[in-house]
Every structure is written in structure tokens, then in C-alpha cells.
């Protein structure tokens, strides 16, 4: 039986999910947090659905062994590939997943033209196709796969010339189509929002789902009387790659230095 003081487990293919973790910390400061970055297998966007599901199951099992009361799948690609299977695997655990913000973007656009930056895996998924069918039938959606962008962010290169050149190339087709709304369909991408702001029109709306995931987690925990109160424990971090590499990047993306454990699953 889960208890209020138990931690929330959050995981992603890499450090992108830290953008979601920041939103959770801001909205639910009493919640203790566990975070797993599967950096040894990043990016998920170019992997098969079967491969991603296996990784998600191993990481989910690990986080539950650490006592997590809820799981947050802070990865759009993993949600598309594995969310349904994880809900079947862990029926007793609250699972909050994420998906590209098609619904709010369709509501926000003024000219009916929406651009999407996402991984190849997300854009090819049946889940994304279903989102378009359900919420975007009245708007034009222009998708742009972004190979290489996750890797730049994983390296901590949020403002450098290579990242700028890559973003300029990725944005060009969307800007040529006159889109007035841009969906960030990967949890890594909010980390380059400041650079994006220099490359897109000031009036273009940029939408991601980190804050919405934090709100959904709050609703799920509250409905089951699992919201924590009081002082949260120090966040705990693990990576499947080199801990020292993640320790180097955490001050940049998380805002403070942290100790990182080695995940072997």
C-alpha cells in the first residue's frame, strides 16, 4: 500500500525529463523525487517500440523497488511506445505519461497552422496519429523530426553554434509554412527555449506539456489521498551511463549539483 510520504519516480531516455521534474518540484514542493536517466540508451526516438518497452519495464521495476508511489513517464517517445503496457504491468501504481500538446496548440493557433518538433519515434507513432485525428482535424499540422537535437542537449550545449545551426535548419520548414504555434514534442526541447526565442517570430506561441504533467500528477495523487505534506527528501538521481557525466550536466539543467547513482538494469 502506497503512503503519502513515498516518493514519485520519474524517468526518461536521458536528461530531458528534468524539464518535467522541475515543473513537478515547482508545483508539488513536498513530494520526494526519484529520477532515472537512461542515458546509455539515448535517444529513444530512433529505437524500436519493442526495445523502448523493455527499457521502460526495467526502469519501472527499479523505481518501484525504491518505493515509488507513482511513476511519471517523462518522455513522449516512451509514452507512445510503452504507456499502455506499463499500465497493464503496474495496475496498482499511478502512472502519468505525456504526449505532444496537440489539443492546446489546436486551440491556441490563430491562423490554423501548427508546427511540431519531435523525435521520429513520436511522429511515427499511432498515438500521435490518434491525437491529430482527435484534436487537429480543423488545423494544418506540419511535423519536423529532429535527429541530433537530443544529443546536443544531452551534451549540455544549449546555446552553442552547432545547436543554433541545427535548430535553424529544423525550424526552416515550419517557418516557411507560416505556423503561428509551435509544439515542443520532446521533454528535452524546453531546455533550448531561450535559443528558440531568438530564431522564431516573437508572436509565435511555444507549447510544451511539462506543467500539464505536473498538474495531472497533482490530480492523480490528490484523488487517492497520496499528496505529500511537509519537507521533501533530497531528490535522488540515477543514470545508466557514466554518473560523472550526469553530475556535470545537472547544475546546467536542474539548477544545482547532485550526486548520481549508477543504474544497472
Swiss-Prot record:
Keywords linked to the UniProt accession: Cell shape, Cell wall biogenesis/degradation, Isomerase, Peptidoglycan synthesis
Active site: 75 (proton donor/acceptor), 186 (proton donor/acceptor)
Catalytic activity: L-glutamate = D-glutamate
Residue sites binding substrate per the record: 12-13, 44-45, 76-77, 187-188
One example of a Gene Ontology biological process annotation: cell wall organization
Record pathway: Cell wall biogenesis; peptidoglycan biosynthesis
Molecular function via GO: glutamate racemase activity
Pfam family, one: Asp_Glu_race
EC number: 5.1.1.3
InterPro entries: Asp/Glu/hydantoin_racemase, Asp/Glu_race, Asp/Glu_racemase_AS_1, Asp/Glu_racemase_AS_2, Glu_race
Function: Provides the (R)-glutamate required for cell wall biosynthesis.
Entry's family note: Belongs to the aspartate/glutamate racemases family.
PANTHER family: GLUTAMATE RACEMASE
UniProt protein name: Glutamate racemase
Amino acid at each position: 500500500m502506497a503512503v503519502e510520504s513515498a516518493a514519485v519516480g520519474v524517468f526518461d531516455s536521458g536528461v530531458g525529463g528534468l524539464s518535467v521534474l522541475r515543473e513537478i518540484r515547482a508545483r508539488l514542493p513536498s513530494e520526494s523525487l526519484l529520477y532515472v536517466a537512461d542515458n546509455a540508451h539515448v535517444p529513444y526516438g530512433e529505437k524500436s517500440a519493442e526495445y523502448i518497452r523493455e527499457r521502460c519495464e526495467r526502469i519501472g521495476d527499479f523505481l518501484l523497488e525504491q518505493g515509488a508511489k507513482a511513476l511519471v513517464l517523462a518522455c513522449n517517445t516512451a509514452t507512445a511506445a510503452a504507456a499502455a503496457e506499463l499500465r497493464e504491468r503496474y495496475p496498482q501504481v499511478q502512472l502519468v505519461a505525456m504526449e505532444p500538446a496537440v489539443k492546446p496548440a489546436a486551440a491556441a493557433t490563430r491562423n490554423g497552422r501548427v508546427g511540431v518538433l519531435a523525435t521520429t519515434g513520436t511522429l511515427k507513432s499511432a498515438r500521435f496519429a490518434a491525437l491529430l485525428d482527435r484534436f487537429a482535424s480543423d488545423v494544418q499540422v506540419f511535423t519536423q523530426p529532429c535527429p541530433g537535437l537530443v544529443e546536443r542537449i544531452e551534451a549540455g550545449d544549449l546555446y552553442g553554434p552547432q545547436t543554433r545551426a541545427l535548430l535553424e535548419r529544423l525550424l526552416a520548414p515550419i517557418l516557411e509554412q507560416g505556423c503561428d504555434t509551435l509544439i515542443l514534442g520532446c521533454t528535452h526541447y524546453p531546455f533550448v527555449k531561450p535559443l528558440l526565442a531568438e530564431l522564431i517570430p516573437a508572436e509565435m506561441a511555444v507549447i510544451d506539456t511539462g506543467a500539464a504533467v505536473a498538474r495531472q500528477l497533482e490530480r492523480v495523487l490528490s484523488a487517492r489521498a497520496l499528496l505529500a505534506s511537509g519537507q521533501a527528501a533530497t531528490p535522488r538521481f540515477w543514470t545508466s551511463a557514466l554518473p560523472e557525466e550526469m553530475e556535470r550536466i545537472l547544475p546546467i539543467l536542474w539548477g544545482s549539483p547532485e550526486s548520481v547513482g549508477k543504474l544497472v538494469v
